[in-house]
Amino acid sequence: MVALAEGVKRRLTMQTVEIADSTTAIRSLDWDRDRFDIEFGLQNGTTYNSFIIQGEKIALIDTSHEKFRQLYLDTLTEQIDPTQLDYLIVSHTEPDHSGLVKDILALAPDVTVVGSKVAIQFLENWVHQPFKQLIVKNGDTLDLGNGHVLEFVIAPNLHWPDTIFTYDAKTQILYTCDAFGMHYCDDHTFDEDLELLEEDFKYYYDCLMGPNARSVLSALKRMSQLPAITTIATGHGPLLHHYVTELTGRYRQWSEEQAKAETTVAVFYLSDYGYSDRLSQAIAHGITKTGVAVEMMDLRWADPQEVRELVSIASGLVIGTPPIAGEVAQKAQTAISTILAAANAKQSVGVFESGAEDSESVYLLANKFRDLGLTPAFPPILIKETPT
């Protein structure tokens, strides 16, 4: 474990490393960050990793946290002329990776933004300006020239619903954003010392990936259909190169153990809405500690059939309060109605406030399930101040 002397503050720093042919990692090193969302205390800071691939065309994979804005943009412009950027690949839209998308669009107005359908929809609502876009599906490819043919892997719920992986056939690098990462900040670009990293690797899995074990297994199955993977370029922490087989094997083992649990709890939340996603992760992490499997689903993008299927296999339900008005209210309320219709009196239920001003009353939502005969798993969770 990297220890920081008491009272000593490390700066936000940048690191650029050529990790393969015409491929550069831009790593934003956040030495002192001690918390990542509510449930995720950090001992060793974190990094936000971004990548440039230069073929005949140039692609940038992910950006950085907005706290690195000027440092990151200065570093990027030292590597390339942003106006020459052809593609911006958004692995997912969580702000720590997409926080500078607007800045990239300002520097490179002709860039094409590449992402899943859900990611592009989210960016349209966030950016509020027209931009060139390319929606990709599983198995789609993008040829940058000079052998850099990118193949996209859809990996929803790792750990956001819009996640994609990107595989470069020439360098055999798989870019996975959050998956297979860890919150660990030091100057080593790669996973040179497994013993030093494995505690943080497991803790990261438990907090973020364990609640989505079945999604992990689905992603691993899709990864197995790719050619050889020599490096996994993660969004946080060191890149995996020396221990790719070992560490992906651990993900498989842990996820299979989690998926075999006899009891499943379904956790329904709303991404980018109040504290819904953060609280749902904290609750899900706590549930997995008891040996119970968790399946998480985002009400913003939930398909009614998928909602029904998940409710039908779950012994317990946890739901964050949805909005009663606004852009996503209708879809979220439809999902809630589907949950209510599919739920049965043998199930337990818990509800929590999302912390947004326009959200439904937590008591009103709880009463709807109580009227159906479901047993409260815990008292409604109220938010009286910013969760920490």
Model-identified regions with their sequence ranges:
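Conserved beta-strand hairpin/beta-sheet module of binuclear metal-dependent hydrolase folds
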Residues: T16-E78, F165-D168, Q172-Y175, S276
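Short, charged N-terminal beta->alpha structural module
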Residues: F268-T290
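Metal-dependent phosphodiesterase/nuclease catalytic metal-binding core
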Residues: I52, F165-Y203, M209-T231, H241-Y269
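Active-site neighborhood of phospho(di)ester-bond hydrolases with catalytic His/Asp-centered motifs
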Residues: I61-T63, L85-T93, V113-S116, L174-C177, ...
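Short acidic active-site motifs
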Residues: L100, A302-V307
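Metallo-beta-lactamase
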Residues: G7, R11, V17-D21, G115-T163, ...
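FMN-binding flavodoxin-like domain, especially the glycine-rich phosphate-binding loop
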Residues: Y184-F190, L196-I232, G237-L239, A282-M297, ...
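Active-site metal-binding motif and surrounding structural segment of the metallo-beta-lactamase
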Residues: E56, K67-V114
